[in-house]
Amino acid sequence: NLKRVTLELGGKSPCIVFADADLDNAVEFAHRGLFFHQGQCCVAASRLFVEESIYDEFVRRSVERAKKYVLGNPLTPGVSQGPQIDKEQYDKIIDLIESGKKEGAKLECGGGPWGNKGYFIQPTVFSNVTDEMRIAKEEIFGPVQQIMKFKSLDEVIKRANNTFYGLAAGVFTKDLDKAVTVSAALQAGTVWVNCYMANSVQCPFGGFKMSGNGRELGEYGLHEYTEVKTVTMKISKKNS
């Protein structure tokens, strides 16, 4: 019983912010790219690389943005974050947050449950995160932002690709040559430049490496529902 399947298996997507980027734009998109839907998003920008010269200011603004979140019933006007999907996922996120604290990441805000009822987790931001930490390697699927520092283009490309996953990525820069170079080098099925999660039904979507196989959407998505046939016919006499 051979099944043909298209698989989208999540990721640990890098988001790279260069010093020449529009900082306000980068902070906002990086924030939305992670905290959307309580962080329960397959393309979440869960490995945020920020160039060294703007790192401290980027962290400050990111923390300021995260602290503006209002938690509660997501159907209530004005609420920006609801609960996690279930207890199993809630426990996994809390465990990963605790691992970040123990492994030496700096907790900038959040870092635990919210309220006394339901599976709510405070919007959490870690700085001084290093690549070997669990929060930098494992898909958290929750409202936990990890901000890492880099010095050079070659370094950040190598670090961004050092993962089993390859679903999506983001690049923030005003330098077109840099944007093209990095986009081509990143091992990801989708790369957004100066934006994040800007999806279109015309664009194929899917992952590299352990993030899956096959594509959804666009012309490539239709190929998954078709069969290719070859017919070869021998003609006894040419007609012309």
Curated annotation (Swiss-Prot):
First-level EC class: oxidoreductase
Subunit structure: Homotetramer.
Active-site feature positions: 8, 42
A GO molecular-function annotation: aldehyde dehydrogenase (NAD+) activity
Catalysed reaction equations from the record: an aldehyde + NAD(+) + H2O = a carboxylate + NADH + 2 H(+)
Family: Belongs to the aldehyde dehydrogenase family.
Entries under InterPro entries matching the protein: Ald_DH/histidinol_DH, Ald_DH_C, Ald_DH_CS_CYS, Ald_DH_CS_GLU, Ald_DH_N, Aldehyde_DH_dom
Organism of derivation: Macroscelides proboscideus (Short-eared elephant shrew)
GO biological process per UniProt: aldehyde catabolic process; ethanol catabolic process
Function, in words: Elephant shrews, in contrast to other mammals, possess both a lens- and a non-lens specific class-1 aldehyde dehydrogenase. Can convert/oxidize retinaldehyde to retinoic acid.
Keyword Transmembrane attached: no
Keywords: Acetylation, Cytoplasm, NAD, Oxidoreductase
UniProt pathway: Alcohol metabolism; ethanol degradation; acetate from ethanol: step 2/2
Tissues in which the protein is found: Non-lens specific, predominant form expressed in the liver.
Enzyme Commission code: 1.2.1.3
Residues modified to N6-acetyllysine: 106, 149, 151, 174
Gene3D superfamilies referenced in this protein's UniProt entry, alphabetically: Aldehyde Dehydrogenase, Chain A, domain 1 (3.40.605.10), Aldehyde Dehydrogenase, Chain A, domain 2 (3.40.309.10)
Keyword Transferase in annotation: no
Gene Ontology cellular component terms for the protein in this record: cytoplasm
Protein name per its UniProtKB record: Aldehyde dehydrogenase, cytosolic 2
Pfam families: Aldedh
Lineage: Eukaryota, Metazoa, Chordata, Craniata, Vertebrata
Protein's cellular compartments: Cytoplasm
Chief location: cytoplasm
